Amino acid sequence: MDAKKLDTGPRDAINWLPDEILGKILSLLATKQAVSTSVLSKKWRTLFKLVDTLEFDDSVSGMGEQEASYVFPESFKDLVDRTVALQCDYPIRKLSLKCHVGRDDEQRKACVGRWISNVVGRGVSEVVLRINDRGLHFLSPQLLTCKTLVKLTLGTRLFLGKLPSYVSLPSLKFLFIHSVFFDDFGELSNVLLAGCPVVEALYLNQNGESMPYTISSPTLKRLSVHYEYHFESVISFDLPNLEYLDYSDYALYGYPQVNLESLVEAYLNLDKAEHVESPDVTKLIMGIRNVEILSLSPDSVGVIYSCCKYGLLLPVFNNLVSLSFGTKKTRAWKLLADILKQSPKLETLIIEDLNGYPLDVSMPLNQVKELQILEYGESDDEVKRLKSFLGEESMIEVVFPEV
């Protein structure tokens, strides 16, 4: 009898693990696979209730042009309905829902609202919604007033319409928005962010019309803005406690308000737009003058150089200790020399290469301790340019990092 137990034990060893461990294992599986274990036995039906992460995706491989008319099928609805029913009211940590809903398809929209309401009632802390809706899609009131939500992702090409005034997400710290369109883009700050009293990080990735033209929050510490559409003319940043900024956009006519007094680290990637003949980045550059770490893409360098030609006076970067400077054209090196003069504490300078560096431009490297050159081939021409760049008696450490 004992021998038989020893023989069968290993094959059934997983059943002897604590329920909490089995629940964690199930949470690592794809939701559809995890659901399938519920048919094994009554115990596994109970164990499935411990799964704290649900991920649903109605995508069908190879849809191609058919995606324009695709909506989630009845089998997808049955899967989600069955899953949430099996879990009853057990706590849940994360819901990820990616699905296609037709224009004016109130039945499917009601399903989405019901699924979201279910997890909100179970204390969800992270929700990822990627809803392809060819009409307006109003978020459920339960989601917009969820007290436990910490991280929210919304997308893609989602038209939300007018947000209700009662938005209240008291625990939300991380907000990711991918091509989401509001009825009024002032609502991003005036309604959505205003209803998030502890939000710390915002990621905005917009590749369509009507970008938010004002981003305002007293609590935001990290902001990434990636805009890929160039018909806005101005943008304002009212973020007194922001510490990190990653801003990629077309250079605009102006930046009416730039309140970034706490900024420590900034990455700028500003391109020239055909419709903006004379961009003015004066207030933006003044607004980032307190940074300790600054990265300027080659396109940004070109924009700033052009603005300097038409009256931009560079501020003193009193706190700047690390500068990454992109170069494409010979004229950029003159701008680098000007920035170095305005950066009395600069210790680390990072450049892509020395191509195009004019030997007659003198670099004031007095405070710089380390020069990093990302691409360097040690040709005679490069050696000559490097010696000219450093000067005769330079004590700067030159580093060639492996990228």
Swiss-Prot record:
Domain of life: Eukaryota
Repeat listed as a keyword: yes
InterPro entries assigned to the protein according to its UniProt record, in alphabetical order: F-box-like_dom_sf, F-box_AtFBL13-like, F-box_dom, FBL60-like, LRR_dom_sf, LRR_FXL15/At3g58940/PEG3-like
Domain F-box: residue ranges: 11-59
Ranges: LRR repeats: 239-262, 288-312
Pfam families, per the entry: F-box, LRR_At5g56370
Keywords: Leucine-rich repeat, Repeat
Full protein name: F-box/LRR-repeat protein At1g06630
Species of the source: Arabidopsis thaliana (Mouse-ear cress)
